[in-house]
Swiss-Prot record:
This is Ankyrin repeat, SAM and basic leucine zipper domain-containing protein 1. It comes from Mus musculus (Mouse). Residues 1-25 are annotated as: Disordered. The gene is Asz1. ANK repeats lie at residues 45-74, 78-107, 110-144, 148-177, 181-210, 214-243. One of its GO terms (cellular component) is cytoplasm. Residues 272-334 form the SAM domain. SUPFAM superfamilies: Ankyrin repeat, Pseudo ankyrin repeat-like, SAM/Pointed domain. The modification Phosphoserine is found at S17, S18, S20. Interacts with DDX4, PIWIL1, RANBP9 and TDRD1.
């Protein structure tokens, strides 16, 4: 394996790399059979072998080297300790072993802590969680920030580790801390589109109104990064989840947030956090968690729920107070409701031309809004199906609705053409009617034309007289 590649792997996820080109991690092939340790080996060779053992995760060789006298907190050329490297690659077994041998869990290099290295490690959430749990058990500070003022919870939220976020808060992490750009853990989760992390942070008391240094809230950050579902969810003013778990003790919080899982390894008590669907997130945001099971039993999707009227909600057994919350939320989510209720009643015989023209103008304006809305959706919709944010229904359902839309648009086109023909027919009949009296505008136009001609004639005569006088004076 190339040394350059492995050097890249040795850099912690927090992005705090060494300025030195030679970081001391020149990893080559390690043959245990040819690397039998002898206590008489020079210190330099022992250190080199130690680095290779850490890289390969060879715990037995690491143990043998430590037994031979190498310091567990040895600082290599770039300043990392063995524990920091093990945490940065989420090697929980190696982290446990080094801690048991007395490694310092609170060590930092240029404000990059071992806990931050673990929270930003490239590994499964299960392995990251194990490492974080071990470090916290050895009194690692969850609020120590790196040079960019990012705390461990921000790294965990950025990488979508819901359980890690919960565990850090349970151990005293400040949920609303801000980095050098004003980002909180919630802002980072919104930026990356981690909806489960967002839901958990709101339960833990995250303030969704805190702004970045350029004045953006988490919802605006989500919209900017095209996470529209998260933008809509965070835009809701109702948020009964906020601070829901803040009053619990540390032990109660851990038990509440992290359930046991008998299928997992015995040395790791935490089970993966259950993923929330769109319906669950919407209901949780309104404090209507109790409705989840009943709606699922009736096969009511979020898309269906969002289109229901009050009578439909009642038919489906939704209580009046719950209906009010849903309808209020839907009102906030509406971008622009097309309301034809205020259009004039054109069926009345007494309707004036102005009212009818006003009706046509409003109808045309509403059609323009519809065209713009569809164009915006086409622009924003991802080309790849796996990037679609609103997973409310299958693409087949979307296609079916689009087919109905096309049919309705064709019907509308036919009706508008009929209306145009009818108006044209009325206009022709009116012009051919001998009893037709010219409109006021027509009469005024005729009079105006005569006045203009008279004015031109008078000016012409005046000009001729003026020229005649000049000619006489010259003579």
């Amino acid at each position: 394996m190339a040394a350059g590649t492995l050097r890249g792997l040795a850099v912690a996820g927090g992005g705090e790399s060494s300025d030195s080109e030679d970081d001391g991690w020149d990893i080559g092939y390690l043959d245990r059979s040819s690397q039998k340790l002898k206590r008489s080996l020079p210190v330099e060779e022992k250190n080199e072998t130690f680095k290779k053992a850490l890289t390969t995760g060879d715990i037995s060789l690491v143990k043998e080297l430590l037994d031979s006298g190498i310091n567990v907190d040895s600082s290599f050329r770039y300043g990392w300790t063995p524990l920091m490297y093990a945490a940065s690659v989420a090697n929980a077994e190696l982290v446990r072993f080094l801690l048991d041998r007395g490694a310092n869990a609170s060590f930092d290099k240029d404000k990059l802590t071992i806990l931050i290295s673990a929270c930003s490690a490239r590994g499964s959430e299960e392995q990251v969680l194990k490492c974080v749990e071990l470090l916290l058990s050895r009194n690692a500070d969850p609020n120590t920030a790196c040079r960019r003022l990012m705390t461990p919870i921000m790294y965990a939220a950025r990488d979508g580790h819901t359980q890690v976020v919960a565990l850090l808060v349970a151990h005293g992490a400040e949920v609303n801390a801000q980095d050098e750009n004003g980002y909180t853990a919630l802002t980072w989760a919104a930026r990356q589109g981690h909806k489960n992390v967002i839901l958990k942070l709101l339960e833990l008391g995250a303030n969704k109104m805190l702004q970045t240094k350029d004045g953006r809230t988490p919802s605006e950050i989500a919209k900017r990064n095209k996470h529209l579902e998260i933008f809509n969810f965070l835009s809701l003013t109702l948020n009964p989840l906020e601070g829901k778990l803040q009053q619990l003790t540390k032990e109660e919080t851990i038990c509440k947030l992290l359930a046991t899982d008998s299928d997992k390894e015995k040395d790791h008590i935490f089970s993966p956090y259950t993923a929330f669907g769109d319906l669950e997130i919407f209901l949780h945001g309104l404090g209507l968690e109790h409705m989840t099971d009943s709606l699922k039993e009736k096969d009511i999707t979020l898309r269906h729920l969002l289109t229901m009227k009050k009578d439909e909600l009642t038919k489906n057994g939704i209580a009046s107070k719950d209906q009010q919350k849903i309808l209020a939320a839907l009102k906030e989510l509406e971008v622009e409701e097309i309301n034809f209720g205020k259009l004039p009643e054109v069926t009345k015989l007494e309707i004036s031309g102005d009212e009818f023209l006003n009706f046509l103008l409003k109808l045309n304006k509403q059609c323009g809004h519809l065209i713009t809305a569809v164009q915006n959706i086409i622009t924003e919709l991802p080309v790849n199906s796996h990037k679609i944010v609103l997973e409310w229904a299958s693409p087949r359902n979307f296609t079916s609705v689009c087919e109905e839309l096309v049919s309705n648009v064709e019907d509308l086109n036919e009706e508008v053409c009929r209306l145009k023909e009818l108006i044209q027919k009325m206009q022709n009949e009116r012009e051919n009617d001998p009893t037709h009296i010219p409109l006021v505008e027509e009469v005024s136009t005729w009079k105006t034309r005569i006045l203009k001609r008279s004015a031109v004639t008078v000016c012409g005569f005046g000009l001729l007289l003026f020229i005649g006088k000049l000619t006489l004076q010259r003579k």
